[in-house]
Structure formats: structure tokens, C-alpha cells
């Protein structure tokens, strides 16, 4: 698939909605054990920021594959609704739809849903990880720790977001697009 998307290809079709729903359900099921793993890893405040980005890759991957306005919010909604009964966070998962979906949607809007190069995907991952990192810093007391731990957490958040959220989505998305199943 070409990196650029035609401006005339912005309208949603039933096919787009169904593919988004199917991908979101599959990635939502994958997100359930990831949620438990990341919840466990929160006990390690110097390691968690690095892997935090893995939880953000599902909606970024769907955005990369579908490339339509609103796809991140729809995908995030489906993924998080699926996680409500199966994760320890329950209904709080729904707050993540706007908290993480909206910044991602804005990033792709700035790129006019046309830029999906590796650098742009890394930026998308960094943005959403920094938003998640702010919540993590406040709620888990990172701001009360030594400045070196704080700096380490910031660097890990940026690198982890770029790699595990942005670039992982690009790499998996490229492999999926090569198969032709999204055509």
C-alpha cells in the first residue's frame, strides 16, 4: 500500500467499519493479557515506562491499516469495551478511549491521514506514551523519586513509545499489508 492516501478516499464504507471492528476485536483480545502484564510490571517503576508503549500499539496499528479519520477513536472504543469485563481496571478502561485515543487522532489529523512513514509512526507512539507517562508519573509517585529516576523514566517513555507503540505498529502493519488481506 502506498504511504500516501488519496484525499478522495476519506469516507468510511461498511467494509472499512467491519475491518476496523474485526481488527479491534482481535487486538482487544491480545490487549487483555498485555494489560495484566503491564499491571504486574508497574511494580518496577524504572522498567515500566519502557514497555508502556506496548499497550498503545493496537489502535495505532489499526490506524496504520485503515487510514481513515476517526479510526483511532473507534478502534480504541472497541478495544477498551472488550477489556472492561476481562481486566482489573474494569470501567476505567473506557476513560482511556479519549485519554489516549484523542491525542493519537490529533497526531494523525495533523498528518492528514497521509503520513505513515516510520518517523511519523514513531512520533505517534511517543505522543501517546508521553500522555500515558504523565498519568503514570503522577499516580505512581515518580515525581517524588530521585531526579535520575525521573530522567530515566522520561527517556524510557520516549524510546518505548517510539519502538513499542509506533514502530511495532509500522512493522506489523507492513507485514499485514504485504499479505493483501486489507485490500
Predicted regions span which residues?
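Membrane-embedded alpha-helical hairpins and interfacial helices in multi-pass inner-membrane proteins
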Residues: 115-183
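Membrane-helix interface "capping/anchor" motifs
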Residues: 61-74, 110-119
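Interfacial aromatic-anchored transmembrane helix boundaries in multi-pass membrane proteins
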Residues: 35-43, 79-108, 140
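Alpha-helical transmembrane segments of multipass membrane proteins
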Residues: 23-34, 58-59, 83, 100, ...
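Short helix-perturbing small/polar motifs within transmembrane alpha-helices
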Residues: 4, 19-20, 29, 96-140
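Hydrophobic transmembrane alpha-helices
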Residues: 2-62
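Hydrophobic alpha-helical transmembrane segments
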Residues: 17-22, 53, 57, 70-77, ...
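Intrinsically disordered, low-complexity non-transmembrane regions of multi-pass membrane transporters
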Residues: 1-7, 178-183
